[in-house]
Design a protein with these regions (language model features):
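Short, amphipathic, aromatic/basic-enriched membrane-interface segments that mark the entry/exit
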Residues: 1-10, 64-71, 117-126, 168-171
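Multi-pass membrane catalytic core of lipid/isoprenoid biosynthesis enzymes
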Residues: 8-13, 54-111
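Alpha-helical transmembrane segments of multi-pass membrane proteins
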Residues: 38-45, 104-114, 152-162
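C-terminal ends of transmembrane helices
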Residues: 50-59, 109-122, 160-170
Length: 172
């Protein structure tokens, strides 16, 4: 049972390795490859919680805080990597590249530290740091730099809004 629990922790941790490979792809200018690694990391994040509950990792490996591990990996994949993509691929006007990326990182720190981020009925309160999906939409919809900047500002503000958003991505 311990081996299974540790394997689940390893699986969760593989998400940050996938994110790192996405980071390398960004630095190599391979946007599509970065999105592939981002998607693989999203897949890992989508099932690791279920696997953790099935393996009872909290009871079997109590010395490892799986929620903290998941938050570290998520912060990287949902916030750091997308912020870098916005900067590297110049998705906002040049004078706002650093402020936009910095704003994403700053509000994401709050998001991942907010213990009330997930509501009791499985919604997220405010914008839940889905910057990876937002960046994908920017590319797929070929939105303008100004549209992207305005969207980023709105999502940053929505991070602090006391409204429920996006329930279908939350593992129950």
């Amino acid at each position: 049972q311990k081996a299974v629990a540790w394997a689940v922790h390893g699986f969760t941790t593989s998400g940050i390795v996938l994110g790192f490979l996405g980071l390398v792809a960004v630095f190599e200018g391979k946007q599509e490859v970065a999105f592939i690694f981002m998607a693989l990391a999203l897949f890992v994040d989508g099932i690791d919680g279920t696997l953790a509950r099935l393996a009872k990792v909290t009871q079997v490996t109590p010395q490892v805080d799986g929620a903290s591990l998941d938050n570290v990996v998520d912060m990287f994949n949902y916030s750091v990597l997308p912020a870098l993509m916005i900067y590297w691929f110049e998705m906002v006007p040049e004078q706002f590249l650093i402020p936009a990326a910095a704003a994403i990182l700053a509000v994401s720190c709050y998001t991942f530290a907010d213990t009330s981020m997930k509501t009791s009925d499985y919604y997220f309160k405010g914008f839940a740091a889905f910057w990876n999906l937002l960046v994908l939409f920017f590319v797929l919809l070929e939105t303008s730099q100004l549209t992207n900047l305005i969207t980023i500002v709105i999502c940053c503000v929505l991070t602090f809004a006391p409204i429920k958003l996006v329930c279908w991505l939350v593992s129950r």
